Amino acid sequence: MKTVKVDLGSDSYRIEIGRGLLSSVGEKLRQLTKAEKIAVVTDDHVRRIYGERIREILKGAGFDVKVIAIPAGEASKNLRVFGDVLEALAGFDMSRSDALVTLSGGVPGDLGGFAAASYMRGIDFFQIPTTILAQIDSSVGGKVAVDLRSGKNLAGAFYQPKGVFIDPDLLSTLPTRYVHDGLAEAVKYGCIGDRELFELFESIETKEDLEKNIEEIILRSVLQKTKFVEEDQYDNGSRQMLNFGHTIGHAIERYFHYSTYTHGEGVAIGMSLLSAQSEKLGYTESGCTDRLRAVLKKLSLPTAIGVPAEELIPHALHDKKRRGKEITLVVMRSIGRAELVKVPTEALADWIVTK
């Protein structure tokens, strides 16, 4: 088992990574919390697979357990479902000393974390991510939120978990498309800060190669995410590097109303398009885009889109990195090295090119 400490002063916590970790989560939580009751927030798909198992694991450690399942999918990440979860916590008569556990991918993780931050002005919460995207990205860093009609993650908070438990065995039930979806974020980490991780992806040729290296990919990704979170907990500076590919990716998601493309697929297209254009503009080392696209295609991830750039740009202007008439783009200089580039919003068309 590997352990990564996220050093945030009084908000510090540990991320544990290891196969079979789920079976010992009850004992670990007993050491980390004084809770008598634990609410498990998950979705209906994960509940069917792991609901009874997590209930028995936590009951075996002496906790009173309630499993709260929301409908699977991004459409559930809204204020109505958020309110339903809060009412369920109140109905379970939870006190401020009790705890919430998210057993899920990103949607219940984000929504459940925001519920933990909000219920009685904050109760302890822990994360057990069940998708590769959640294991390497959304479960690390304390961003919790729900979507509004106007856009993704517009209502939320920074609220760190008390612990994260990553069990790669939980990925065995994940459809291949969603494994690759999550790995887009791992490729991103390679592009912005870990050249060796990127080269590891270049060396992977088969499904067996990927399975053999998945723990290393998870660990290196978590270390990269942790580094940026420790430097910039509240996302005002270097942590924005983690948004490589996301300005275009989020625009694609908004354009298609969060259907058609997964988050990781949108990010893959965003990285590919921005890298190609920044290479043409002289910001990115020659050849990087070809290498990036080769890795993305190996993972069956898209690298282009048949939508005119002028239709994506209005959606890109909703990006959280926009400040007034300026937007910050994350530009890869070379494999493993990126920087933030401030671009006037009227010049965004020079950077978002889909042809």
For every predicted segment, state its role.
Residues 16, 114-206:
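A glycine/threonine-rich phosphate-anchoring loop and its flanking beta-alpha core
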Residues 7, 93-95, 118-119, 147-148, ...:
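Solvent-exposed alpha-helices and their adjacent loops that cap or buttress functional pockets
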Residues 107-114, 135, 251:
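Short glycine/serine/threonine-rich phosphate/pyrophosphate-binding segments
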Residues 2, 184-186, 283-355:
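C-terminal charged capping/lid subdomain of soluble metabolic enzymes
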Residues 18, 40, 78, 129, ...:
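Residue-level signal for inorganic ion chemistry
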Residues 1-99:
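ATP/NTP phosphate-donor binding region
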Residues 199-310:
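Active-site segments that bind and position negatively charged phosphate/pyrophosphate groups
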Residues 86-100, 112-127:
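Non-catalytic interfacial helical region
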